[in-house]
Amino acid sequence: IIEAVKNALNPDAAEEAGMPFEQPDVLVIGAGMAGLTTAARAAELGLNVLIVDQAATYGGSANVAGGTLLGAGTRMQKEAGIEDDPDLCFADFVRLGGAGNFNEEIAREFAEISGEAVDWLDDLGTDFGDRVPYYGVYQPLNVARNYSGKGGARAFVVSLYAELEKYFSTNAYMMLNTYVTGLVTNDEGAVIGAKARLADGTETTLLAPATVICTGGYAGNEELLNKYNFENVLSTSPACVTGDGYAWLEELGAPLTNMDFCTAYAGGIPTSDDFRSFGYFNATNGALWINTNGERMANETGADSHVKSETWANAPHNIVYTVFSSEMLIPDAKVFSTGAWGSVKEEFDPYMESLIEKGLAWKADTVEELAEKVGLPVDTFAATIAAYNDGCANGNDPFGRTAQEVAMANGPFYAVK
């Protein structure tokens, strides 16, 4: 192993020291937040730890994630006068996740140790900003037990790496640019390490009594997203989040469960040919959501992000058209955003023209013409708009909508895919 690591040395580590042990006790695959947590804690406990990652840097998706943690009974809750315990935390898991939809034994263990884990990160000097727990944004918890790192999840990466770095001269080592190709098993079928390819193409085997797979999800893998979740999907995940660990475990006969569960935002517009690049269109007051059959699907103004996501997930081909008229445009709106904090103000007409040129938007003088341009069933779409307009006039929207009832009476009309 010592020879194998020479070409994959972490530039932030003490290069001159080399790997401080001949054989690791623990091999950690993946240097994102889970891997850094595992490696740092194992090193604290005195184990020899080798952590590897296919990327050129550590942190994984935590380098770009918003950075929210959950913990029950934490020091920060006590400081804020908030009473909480693992039972209340577990009750939230059942309420929000649905009994039977998750491994309750693991969830119970998570609830029991979550507060201690958050306090440990606090002890490491993590910058939690104002240190005020909160309920959550989309589906509020029963107790304020969410915490955010200042500046996002990168705050956690910084403190975890700093803790792990303390042990680089004694019992921890990191190999980046190291692509694991599969797991190694003994004659009894137990995992005893991994096969890996270094940056220079060298193939090697990394052995350890314990192997911990911390390769994260698969949100950067379009093939797996298409297979398990969505026919059409965009992602902001880093390219390194490929879900390789699932394939390794499946090869060994491990059952994969709940792979069809994926929390996703709705309404992305591609900004390049890379499926990991998209943004949102924001400039309307009460636009309609129309599926590929030319039909509405929900009360657009009464839907929270969860309902909106469900609407997109259940739409044919996961495609929805945001349809609106010029009367629905918000003057001086921030037309486009790349996330919750990335809204930008653009001139509407040039931006819309750019979408039209890319085949992502259409403009027409009549509802029927718009349907023809988009490729929607003309009669169905026209009837949908007529029913919406009747609802605006009579106060009886087909989906119970009572807000932002702006009739689509006059063109031009627009559709954004």
What are these regions (language model features)?
Residues 1-26, 44:
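Extreme N-terminal leader/targeting segments of oxidoreductases
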Residues 18, 48, 54-57, 61-173, ...:
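Conserved N-terminal/central alpha/beta ligand/cofactor-binding core
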Residues 24-51:
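N-terminal Rossmann-like FAD-binding beta1-loop-alpha1 element of flavoenzymes
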Residues 98, 103-117, 125, 332-394:
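N-terminal leader/propeptide and maturation segments of large enzyme subunits in energy/redox metabolism
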Residues 148-204, 209, 246, 252:
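Helical element adjacent to the flavin cofactor pocket in flavoenzyme catalytic cores
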Residues 182-184, 190, 380-417:
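A glycine-rich dinucleotide-binding beta-alpha-beta segment and adjacent secondary-structure elements
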Residues 199-202, 206-272:
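Glycine-rich loop(s) and the adjacent beta-strand/alpha-helix scaffold that form part
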Residues 246-248, 255-373:
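An anion/pyrophosphate-binding glycine-rich loop and adjacent beta-alpha core
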